[in-house]
């Protein structure tokens, strides 16, 4: 149905979208998202996180109860895993007492840094465990996942969902994952191994992986909307009127865009602790950057030993926090680019309606109002990642983060030298 004749390439129909979805890259991207989601879901079910069950019939997640006996066994195993190195905790407490009463100068500095890092690890681990088990967080996650499924389904039905996985983001994430795996393997065989530190890294990565997949889904939603508007503009550039079925699509498009923004605000407000935890890794990063500088520039070890000690000890804790922040910053920059492109396309669409549709028609007035509210909403509540204290995590922040790490680590090295500390030998920890 149309107010004018159809051209052979008139509209990007559902059939065309289904053909497009069978292309190898679309199949690959679709399987990546589905595979990642099922892996995260399977881990949650296996370890009794969240107590949510996916209902394939309704395409929604629902609260469920696990088997009572098996659930109790899993809880006992979790407690044992956390409490197993009790002797090491006792030694750690004794060491803290001795350092507080006896240690001074650069050794006191190193001890204080270690204590700060350990305190942050324990605090973040506590929040991670609460997030994975608390009923309030379960409700938040249930709402978020159901919104993601609903928006994806709506885009699929009305516009044709095009999945897009940013290759640069994925490469950076996989590089971080590889470095983290090497670091965890090294940590596992350390004589001072503590299961709480190991769990901190593993659970933080599990939660961040889910957040990263969510960010990629956001970018896919924007890509789908942008693609639809581009084809709308191409289709009507040389037409005298606008096809009727497009009227019924543009209003739901604005509604979905508003729903996407509200969802991201909801997610950002409820998992702000996760981005804060990522930022607080800066202490781990600084402390290990100091060790890396001392070992690479001042230690008298052989080059082969230096490389091994750096790789085995401090390289991972330096690189992983920076890569976490870099990923969040890159996502924010891509959100900004997508929103700018979306604004430009909406301006062009509104211009087409002003020229090709009578201005007193209801659709033209509604479209103008929706466009105005969208621009205001994007200005007041842009789609972005906040890191700490409502600071936006973008490329500028990432650069500030890296510079802060380097300058602070150099200051700590300078203080160690000025107090006569020993830096002539490589160490992986102090």
From Swiss-Prot:
A single GO molecular function term of this UniProt record: ligand-gated channel activity
UniProt membrane topology term: Multi-pass membrane protein
Glycosylation-annotated residues: 422
Stretches assigned to coiled coil: none
Transmembrane segments: 32-52, 80-100, 111-131, 169-189, 278-298, 307-327, 397-417
Sequence ranges on the Cytoplasmic membrane side: 1-31, 101-110, 190-277, 328-396
Domain of life the protein comes from: Eukaryota
More about this protein: Gustatory receptor-like proteins are divergent proteins which do not belong to the canonical gustatory receptor or olfactory receptor families but display some structural similarity. They are predicted to be ligand-gated seven transmembrane domain ion channels.
Protein name according to UniProt: Gustatory receptor-like 43a
């Amino acid at each position: 149905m149309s107010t004018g004749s159809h051209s052979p390439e008139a509209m990007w129909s559902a059939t065309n979208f289904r053909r497009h979805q069978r292309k190898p890259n679309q199949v690959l991207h679709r399987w990546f998202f589905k595979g990642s989601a099922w892996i995260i879901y399977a881990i949650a079910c296996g370890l009794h996180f969240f107590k949510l069950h996916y209902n394939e019939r309704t395409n929604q997640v629902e609260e469920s109860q696990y088997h009572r006996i098996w659930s109790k066994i899993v809880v006992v195993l979790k407690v044992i895993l956390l409490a197993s190195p009790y002797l090491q905790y006792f030694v750690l407490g004794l060491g803290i007492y001795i350092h507080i009463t006896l240690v001074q100068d650069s050794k006191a500095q190193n001890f204080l840094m270690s204590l700060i890092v350990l305190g942050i690890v324990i605090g973040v681990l506590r929040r991670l465990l609460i997030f994975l088990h608390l009923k309030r967080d379960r409700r938040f996650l249930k709402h978020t996942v159901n919104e993601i499924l609903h928006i994806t389904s709506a885009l699929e039905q009305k516009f044709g969902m095009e999945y897009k996985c940013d290759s640069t983001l994925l490469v950076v994430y996989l590089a971080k994952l590889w470095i983290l795996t090497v670091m965890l393997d090294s940590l596992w065989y350390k004589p001072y191994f503590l299961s709480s530190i190991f769990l901190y890294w593993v659970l933080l990565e599990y939660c961040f992986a889910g957040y990263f997949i969510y960010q990629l889904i956001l970018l896919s939603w924007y890509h789908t909307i942008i693609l639809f508007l581009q084809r709308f503009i191409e289709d009507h550039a040389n037409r005298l009127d606008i096809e009727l079925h497009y009227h019924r699509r543009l209003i739901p498009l604005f509604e979905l865009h508003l729903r996407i923004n509200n969802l991201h605000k909801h997610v950002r407000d409820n998992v702000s602790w996760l981005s804060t935890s990522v930022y607080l890794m800066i202490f781990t990063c600084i402390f290990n950057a100091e060790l890396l500088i001392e070992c690479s520039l001042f230690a008298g070890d052989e080059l082969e030993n230096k490389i091994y000690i750096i790789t085995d000890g401090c390289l991972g804790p330096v690189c992983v926090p920076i890569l976490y922040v870099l990923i969040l910053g890159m996502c924010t920059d891509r959100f900004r680019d997508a929103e700018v492109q979306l604004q430009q396309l909406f301006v062009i669409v509104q211009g087409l309606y002003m020229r090709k549709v009578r201005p007193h028609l209801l659709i033209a007035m509604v479209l103008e109002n929706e466009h105005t509210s969208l621009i205001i909403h994007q200005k007041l509540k842009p789609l972005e990642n906040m890191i700490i204290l409502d600071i936006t995590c973008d490329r500028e922040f990432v650069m500030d983060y890296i510079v802060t790490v380097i300058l602070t680590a150099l200051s700590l090295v300078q203080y160690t030298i000025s107090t006569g500390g020993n830096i002539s030998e490589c160490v992986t920890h102090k």
